[in-house]
């Protein structure tokens, strides 16, 4: 069965959804614009199958995406597989934002283990009865509903497995303003997740933590360099000894964390050369802090 849910669209999509509903295998649901989590819950309550697969309007699944997830569904020893998640490939357009986003998401999937803590919204399927028994998707989670429901399943003893063979293709994510708004929203959702699900290790954060700490640690490193220069200026003669003595324990302690951050940044896939890329990282870091603090 195919279930289409229209979340109060105003671009003519409702007519198209109702047109498709004439097919015997298609169920169409229209509702007011109350959010993606409520959409998924409406579909879940209408579904009849053993497995409940979800995707989004801004992706195009490969024809075999559900077959590939079903292949990965059998539980191994000690597992109770309740969800399977696949891989989302972000397209690239002729702008820096889409390239950064595409490369970042690709790097996350490259290091993703088979057993994971997140069934991503664009490409996942769930044991329908298990998900319903835990309350399904919470409509109050307007965003990050996939994170919330995944952790609910894991805390109940379930296993989520990842298969790279199930693929959906995401449209390019373009535009700096929209990108920053989404990252701010992501940060706010992570705060909410950590408050509700304490002690749960998340394995799909990727390079966001590097970007998050960019502003404070670069500022801390700059202060350490300024302190070192200040110490140097107190010497009458600049030689090897003065350069060594100016490197006080305070300077070392202040600079050690920024050096660890710099090492992680240089090993990441984040942009490092072009000024525009650096500017995007700075504004991205600010957006994350806004989402956390505001």
Annotate the PLM regions.
Residues 12, 16, 57-72, 151:
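Acidic donor-binding/catalytic loop of UDP-sugar-dependent glycosyltransferases
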Residues 31-47, 68, 118:
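Glycine-rich, basic loop-to-helix element that forms the pyrophosphate-binding segment
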